[in-house]
């Protein structure tokens, strides 16, 4: 099964891909100018990589969980993805990503950290599933 993970942010959307449970690759992040443009760009990536399922990171257990689920559901509606959508706890994934990249891109905001976060989210999902 082919997966893409999405780390949905206000400025950038991190993406990561896996066709095998032991290998997850960060992809180029989507710059988010507006919702419609971001949804089109994400959909294009999903089609290009021929994915079967999407794993979306959401913060579980916090007071904002319901609101985030609503926002994610709205965004995925705009993407109009026909495959399966799974949710995975994204807690601390950005902190982990920054720790992994420490020193390399401290001041660069090009989406690499966002896509590393998506990679971590997908790794967590695949570890729990398999």
Curated annotation (Swiss-Prot):
**SUPFAM superfamilies, per this entry?**
Ribonuclease H-like
User: Could you tell me which Pfam families the record lists for this protein?
Assistant: RuvX
Question: What keywords is this UniProt entry annotated with?
Answer: Cytoplasm, Hydrolase, Nuclease, Ribosome biogenesis
Q: What class of enzyme is it?
A: hydrolase
Signal peptide segment: none
Give the E.C. number(s): 3.1.-.-
Its annotated compartments are:
Cytoplasm
According to its UniProt entry, the protein's GO biological process terms are: rRNA 5'-end processing
Superkingdom of origin:
Bacteria
Give the matching InterPro entries: RNaseH-like_sf, YqgF, YqgF/RNaseH-like_dom, YqgF/RNaseH-like_dom_sf
Q: Record's Gene Ontology CC terms?
A: cytosol
Mainly localized where? cytoplasm
Q: A GO molecular function for this record?
A: nuclease activity
Which family is it part of? Belongs to the YqgF nuclease family.
**Any idea what job this protein has?**
Could be a nuclease involved in processing of the 5'-end of pre-16S rRNA.
- Check the record and name the NCBIfam families matching this protein: PRK00109.2-2, RNAse_H_YqgF
What is the protein named? Answer: Putative pre-16S rRNA nuclease
Ranked from the top, the taxonomy reads:
Bacteria, Pseudomonadati, Campylobacterota, Epsilonproteobacteria, Campylobacterales
